[in-house]
């Protein structure tokens, strides 16, 4: 009994000498600082955006100036009684000035390629009682391939719009309207619309593979407020121009339609 009592006493003493571990208290680790959102740099303004009317030239550009247009230069291409047309260097588009208000369009026109001033026409083309500005641009002149584009600029109270009546846009609509028939036996291609037509006979060596036909040239003729587009039809394999497709441009204030379409031959079979 004494031995057991001594053992119990020793156990109690040991228990009393043992230190209690302090309770562990959870503390969150310091939060990593949130990175500040990257601030995008403000886009740089285009060199021409600060231009005002007094900064613009008043004299028409000469052919020499057209050929030497600088990257940050403005040239006056033409004017009517109320509108002036400018080209911006560095392929930056054009500016229109009307009643003290500038309108910018990013259309590509390189006077270095044509060395020709555009021609400006002021007329009420859509019949709304207000004049629009139509501009005929020479876009390409290489050998017998000459391409003009027409742009119609229309002003409302707040905005100015540009309707491009280009060679490609007119060609797409004309191709959808005309009929082309090829006879491999005789090697003849007939291009027709209504009761108008033109016929081209391919040389013998091309008859099995005549290739494509395209409208490769364009010109816009103006008379009494009506523009007529003249598209030159060419056989790609031989390079022969064999027909013109003509159509009047009807502008409705938003888009254009080809009216009075006809085919005229330019070669004799």
Question: Where are the regions that the model predicts?
Answer:
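N-terminal, intrinsically disordered, polar/charged segments of Gram-positive cell-envelope systems
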Residues: 20-100
